[in-house]
Every structure is written in C-alpha cells, then in structure tokens.
C-alpha cells in the first residue's frame, strides 16, 4: 500500500485515491498467476467466501460468533449454522459457476459430458422452482440469477447434516432441548441465520441485485427439497412446507 496516499485534507479525496489504487492493483494482476495467499475479506468481516481461481474457502475470524457459532450452544445448532456455511462455501466449487474451474483454479471443462448433462438437468429444475416463487405482489424471484447460491445452500445443508450424523456415531442421541429434538435443532440453527424482516421496497431491490435468495426462501425453498427435514418435523402432505417427492430436486 506504499503507493496509496492518505491525507487529512478531504474524506472524499481519500476515498477517490483508495478507489483508484484498488483499480490499479486489479489491473496490474491481469495476465498473471493468482496469488493464493491473498485474502479477499478482512478478519473483521462477518462473511465467508469460496474463490474458484485459488480453489480455497475463507472464514474470517468475525464469523466465528453467534448466531453462526456459539461455544455454549449444542452441536446440532452449530452444525446447522456454521456447519452449513462451511458446506455452502465448499459446494460453490461445484455450482453452476465454480464447476467450470479445475482443482488448480484454471478455467477448464473437466467434467464428463454425462455428468454435465445430468447436472444441467437438475440445475434447470431447481432454477425454475425458485423462479416460481412470488416474492411480493406479482413479482417472481429470479431462479437463474440465484442458482449458484441456491445450489450452495442446499449442498451446505446436505454436507453439514451428514457431518453432524457422523459426529453422533457411537454416542447416545442427545436429549431434546426446549422441546426440540437434535434433528430439529439442526434445522433451527440454519433457519435462525436468515431471519429477516424487510420492507417490500427492499425485497424488490434485493431481488434485482442480490445473487442470494431472500432469507425466507434460503430457508423455506431449500428445506422443502431435503427428505431429512421432512423426517425431523414429521411433515405431511397438505402442510405448507410439503412438496411431492417427485418435485424435489437435489443437486448433490
């Protein structure tokens, strides 16, 4: 950052110089191998990411706190929260964008034609499923725009749930807490991450610009495709969260 000059004369001028430095830094990297030691987020950022060009997942220190991770919470809640986030980022390596990169981070078509065709078939069904959602009034979600994140949400749920079940091998089933079984608490841990109460105007704005589905649908739409969720809450045909088995889509 030695070329970046910060002065006490003007806030706007500092922002302008910082933006110009950032632009120049990105341009200077063009045509060069990716720096696999570079982080794209600060330690203070409450978020996580997968970088396909370096084939790595990153979890800044700030995300290791409630509601994502709680030292005092039971394993089910933590697996359903930070566990799903970890699985989510892992799955990005195999979503509609990440699958185009090989293990070295090169843009390369490394899938067999058969695998690619089956993936596309399932992905198209999942995209349509989300596009059928009405977010407000007569406005629909954009399942194609949010496809990568929806695949990652589903993959994260599947991977984290499997990891949680593996952690219970040879142990007694945990006793219910607050009236909820351990299986139910796994999904409650996930749902708790995306609780959201926003105005219709914000719903419309996010639907246009955010590649993630709205919080409500990151939970409800994702879980309706997962058989284990039905078992955990004993969901029956005719109930709001029920979806016919033939209509459920699982990518991975």
Language-model regions: role of each:
Residues 1-252:
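Intrinsically disordered, low-complexity linker/terminal regions across diverse proteins
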């Amino acid at each position: 950052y030695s070329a970046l000059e910060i002065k006490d004369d003007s806030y706007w001028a500092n922002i302008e110089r910082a933006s110009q430095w950032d632009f120049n830094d990105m341009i200077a990297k063009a045509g060069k191998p990716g720096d696999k030691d570079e982080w794209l987020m600060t330690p203070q950022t409450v978020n996580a990411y997968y970088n396909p060009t370096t084939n790595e997942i990153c979890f800044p220190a700030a995300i290791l706190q409630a509601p994502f991770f709680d030292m005092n919470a039971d394993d089910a809640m933590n697996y359903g929260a930070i566990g799903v986030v970890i699985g989510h980022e892992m799955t990005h390596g195999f979503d509609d964008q990440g699958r185009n990169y090989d293990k070295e981070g090169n843009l390369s078509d490394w899938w067999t034609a058969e695998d690619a065709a089956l993936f596309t078939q399932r992905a198209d069904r999942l995209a349509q499923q989300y596009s059928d959602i009405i977010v407000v009034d007569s406005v629909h979600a954009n399942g194609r725009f949010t496809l990568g994140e929806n695949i990652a949400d589903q993959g994260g749920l599947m991977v984290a749930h499997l990891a949680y079940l593996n952690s219970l091998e040879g142990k007694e089933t945990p006793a219910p807490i607050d009236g909820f079984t351990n299986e139910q608490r796994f999904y409650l841990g996930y749902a708790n991450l995306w609780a959201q109460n926003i105005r219709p105007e914000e719903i419309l704005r996010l639907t246009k610009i955010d590649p993630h589905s709205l919080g409500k649908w990151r939970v409800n739409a994702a879980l309706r495709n997962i058989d284990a969720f039905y078992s955990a809450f004993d969901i029956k045909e005719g109930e709001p969260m029920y979806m016919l088995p033939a209509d459920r889509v699982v990518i991975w």
